[in-house]
């Protein structure tokens, strides 16, 4: 059970680091008055970010209540979110190849999507470890 505690702590730390890596480049971008995200980027990421927030809240509730009913569905949701975020990255890379939009904005956007993907992955892993820890 010490292993699960340590793994859980590692995943929680990774979530915090990913959120920091997500937020800092966006803040720098805004502070430097660089171009905003394109309407397509805002729309695409906005749709998935609402789903990510819902997923994170459900995971937090499950861990807090120590009630793992619906665990498999949440893990399936994490896989769906990861696939959606991968599709966003592919779409952005196609836009870069088509030379539409600012490369600097694209890099900030790709970083946002990657770190959001990390948050989802680490949260799903934290959920798995928490459940294993509680079963012991």
Can you describe what each PLM-predicted range is?
Residues 1-136:
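Cytosolic, long alpha-helical scaffolding segments
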């Amino acid at each position: 059970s010490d292993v699960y505690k340590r793994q859980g702590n590692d995943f929680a730390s990774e979530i915090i680091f990913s959120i920091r890596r997500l937020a800092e480049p966006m803040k720098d971008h805004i502070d430097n008055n660089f171009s905003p995200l394109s309407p397509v980027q805002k729309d695409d990421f906005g749709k998935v970010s609402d789903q990510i927030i819902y997923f994170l809240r459900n995971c937090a509730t499950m861990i807090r209540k120590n009630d793992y009913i619906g665990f498999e569905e949440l893990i399936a949701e994490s896989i769906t979110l990861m696939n959606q975020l991968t599709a966003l990255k592919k779409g952005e890379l196609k836009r870069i190849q088509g030379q539409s939009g600012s490369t600097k904005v694209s890099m900030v956007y790709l970083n946002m999507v990657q770190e959001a993907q990390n948050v989802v992955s680490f949260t799903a892993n934290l959920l798995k470890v928490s459940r294993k820890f509680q079963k012991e």
